[in-house]
């Protein structure tokens, strides 16, 4: 593990950029970027176009270590290059931004009020490749729809079981049990979730380190004891469907919680913009998300 990267993620000022739209969400991301579905005829072309979008974001002069601590990449991006370097190497060597990899394969159907992760059949191989490509950590998402104690326990157990496998491979897992922001009992779900996470953290070996990616809590500063836990490198927040303005406003009220936004980061960016327009738009977004993250 790279100690410089660990120090940067643990104590640095800034946020984590989520650039990990997967195959399922890529058409929507491209559409928002101004590229219609008839612009590509197969998955390869689609991933090629989305890599160009990500490359444009990463290479932007606004995308700097001053504001951004890390970036979460989709598996396909890990194997692609920017200026003849693999994307993770470009991020760290050229930008001093720590690379993470999304490892989950999507969600199961809702059961017991939650959506667990689908089995990650190639996890060992994927982690091996991630280490070879100088990835620092991983991210995997599951979703809580209802305050169902049984479901939430199962979901957190699954996250930590896989998390331990990731730690053994020499990487830092971002554990992401998202609470659906539209859930009618969101606050109750958050209470159950925090209890389960605290229980799992208490069972970890002293040297085991994890990160958490959580929905912005209903009650401000509700996750402060997770932020202060010695096993937790950092707690980051997802925007979860809030608009950029609302996500930033809510985040700013939670001390020690930093952003890991994707939609809120790329909002307003289009393929048709000139470099000046593109860089101006993303610069404004980055600075505003950063300001909310350091409160």
UniProtKB/Swiss-Prot annotation:
Signal sequence, start to end: none
Pfam families: Glycolytic
Record-annotated active site: 176 (proton acceptor), 213 (schiff-base intermediate with dihydroxyacetone-p)
Gene3D superfamilies (UniProt xref): Aldolase class I (3.20.20.70)
NCBIfam families in UniProt: PRK05377.1
Family: Belongs to the class I fructose-bisphosphate aldolase family.
Name of the molecule in the record: Fructose-bisphosphate aldolase class 1
Species: Clostridium beijerinckii (strain ATCC 51743 / NCIMB 8052) (Clostridium acetobutylicum)
